[in-house]
C-alpha cells in the first residue's frame, strides 16, 4: 500500500509534465492529499524522505547538468573559434616581400626558437603561429624535394648495376660454354723452326751438291788471255778481286777512296807496217 502511495506521489510531482487546466487540477489536489497522509502515517521517516532525496538528486543532477551544459557551450564556442581560425588560416595570403623575407630567414635558420619566432612575426605583422606553420611547411617541402632527388639518384644507380649484372652474366655464360667445348679441341704448340727428318735429309743433301756445282763451274771456266798492254792491269785487277772478299768497303765513300786497280791511261798499240 505504501508503494502505491509512493508511486502516486512520484507521479504527482512529475516536473516534466506540463500543468493541466480544468477538472484535472482537482484530481491532482486529491493525489497530493493522499500522498501527504501517506507520508504522515508512515512509521519510517526515511521512507518519507525518499521523494525529497529523489528531488534533491534531481536537483543535483540538474546542477551537474548545468555545468555540463556550460561545458557543451564552451566546446561549441571552441569549435566555432577553431572554425574561425581555420578560415583565417585558409585566407592567409603572404605578400612577395613577406615570402622573400621568410625564405631568407629559412636559408639562415631552418628552425626558430620562440624568441626568433616572435621577432619575425612582429617584423612581418603576422602571428607567431602563422610563422611556425610556414616554417613547418617549408621544411616538409625541402625534405620532399631531397627525397625525390635521392630517389632519382638511386634509380640511376640501380639501372647501372642491372646493366653491369646483365653483362657479367653474359660473360659467365660464354666462359662456361668455352669450358664445355674445350676438351674437343687440342692445344696447338707454339710456332717453332723445327724441321721434319725428311726435310732435314733433303736440305743436307742439297747443300754439298750446290757447293760441288759451284766448284765445278769455277774450274771449268778457261782463263782469259791477257793482252800485251794490259798485263799489269790484269794482275792488279786479279789482286783486287782476291782481296775484295777480305776487304769490302763499308760505305759509298770508302768505295771511291779505295785505290783503283786499273791504269789511268791505256798504252798505245803498235801500228802495223804499211806497204809502200
Swiss-Prot record:
Q: Which family does it belong to?
A: Belongs to the HD-ZIP homeobox family. Class II subfamily.
Protein biosynthesis is among the record's keywords: no
Q: Where is this region: Disordered?
A: 1-92, 214-244
Q: What is this protein called?
A: Homeobox-leucine zipper protein HOX11
- Listed Polar residues bias regions: 39-48
An example of a Pfam family matching this protein is HALZ
Q: What does this protein do?
A: Probable transcription factor.
InterPro entries (alphabetical): HD, HD-ZIP_Homeobox_LZ_Class_II, Homeobox_CS, Homeodomain-like_sf, Leu_zip_homeo
One GO cellular component assignment for this chain's record is: nucleus
A GO molecular function term, named singly, is:
sequence-specific DNA binding
Query: According to the UniProt record, where is the region Leucine-zipper?
Result: 145-189
Q: Which UniProt keywords apply?
A: DNA-binding, Homeobox, Nucleus, Transcription, Transcription regulation
Q: Which residues bind DNA?
A: 87-146
* Species assigned in the record: Oryza sativa subsp. indica (Rice)
Give compartment(s): Nucleus
Query: What's the superkingdom here?
Result: Eukaryota
Tissue-level expression reads: Expressed in stems, leaf sheaths and blades and panicles.
Extent of Gly residues compositional bias: 58-73
Amino acid at each position: 500500500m505504501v508503494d502505491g502511495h509512493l508511486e502516486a506521489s512520484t507521479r504527482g510531482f512529475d516536473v516534466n509534465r506540463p500543468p493541466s487546466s480544468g477538472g484535472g487540477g482537482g484530481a491532482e489536489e486529491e493525489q497530493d492529499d493522499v500522498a501527504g497522509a501517506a507520508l504522515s502515517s508512515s512509521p519510517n521517516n526515511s521512507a518519507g524522505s525518499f521523494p525529497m532525496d529523489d528531488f534533491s538528486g534531481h536537483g543535483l543532477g540538474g546542477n551537474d547538468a548545468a555545468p555540463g551544459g556550460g561545458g557543451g557551450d564552451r566546446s561549441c564556442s571552441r569549435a566555432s573559434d577553431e572554425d574561425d581560425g581555420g578560415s583565417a588560416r585558409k585566407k592567409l595570403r603572404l605578400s612577395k616581400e613577406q615570402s622573400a623575407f621568410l625564405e631568407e630567414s629559412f636559408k639562415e635558420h631552418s628552425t626558430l626558437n620562440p624568441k626568433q619566432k616572435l621577432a619575425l612575426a612582429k617584423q612581418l605583422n603576422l602571428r607567431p603561429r602563422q610563422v611556425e606553420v610556414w616554417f613547418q611547411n617549408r621544411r616538409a617541402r625541402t625534405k620532399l624535394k631531397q627525397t625525390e632527388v635521392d630517389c632519382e639518384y638511386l634509380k640511376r644507380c640501380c639501372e647501372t648495376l642491372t646493366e653491369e649484372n646483365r653483362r657479367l652474366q653474359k660473360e659467365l655464360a660464354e666462359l662456361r660454354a668455352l669450358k664445355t667445348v674445350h676438351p674437343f679441341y687440342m692445344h696447338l704448340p707454339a710456332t717453332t723452326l723445327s724441321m721434319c727428318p725428311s726435310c732435314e735429309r733433303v736440305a743436307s743433301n742439297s747443300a754439298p751438291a750446290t757447293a760441288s756445282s759451284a766448284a765445278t763451274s769455277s774450274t771449268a771456266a778457261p782463263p782469259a788471255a791477257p793482252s800485251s798492254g794490259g798485263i799489269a792491269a790484269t794482275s792488279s785487277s786479279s789482286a783486287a778481286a782476291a782481296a775484295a772478299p777480305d776487304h769490302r768497303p763499308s760505305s759509298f765513300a770508302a768505295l771511291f777512296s779505295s785505290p783503283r786497280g786499273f791504269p789511268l791511261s791505256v798504252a798505245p798499240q803498235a801500228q802495223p807496217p804499211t806497204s809502200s
